[in-house]
Amino acid sequence: MDIKLINIGFGNIVSANRIIAIVSPESAPIKRIITEARDRGMLIDATYGRRTRAVIITDSDHVILSAVQPETVANRLVSKEAAQVDEPTD
């Protein structure tokens, strides 16, 4: 299994294979998920002090905060997958 990495902003990289969801932090349920992850010690803040614009939820129950828009992260994820499909295999 190949490890696919995705840039989530400011040089921070996450394994794309582990991402379950990329969501906006605005709703109350997502804010609750962030608070619960902080209490469990499963929160990773990759915003560098900037405003949180995307919340990435992984299959290991880690919650990652990013200062990049969810659409941008999703586009990077899709473009990485498309690039791998286009690569010739010998």
Curated annotation (Swiss-Prot):
InterPro entries referenced in this protein's UniProt entry, alphabetically: RemA-like (IPR007169)
Domain of life where this protein originates: Bacteria
PANTHER family membership: REGULATORY PROTEIN SSL2874-RELATED (PTHR38449:SF1), REGULATORY PROTEIN TM_1690-RELATED (PTHR38449)
HAMAP family noted in UniProt: RemA (MF_01503)
Family statement: Belongs to the RemA family.
Official protein name in the record: Putative regulatory protein Dred_1699
Species the sequence originates in: Desulforamulus reducens (strain ATCC BAA-1160 / DSM 100696 / MI-1)
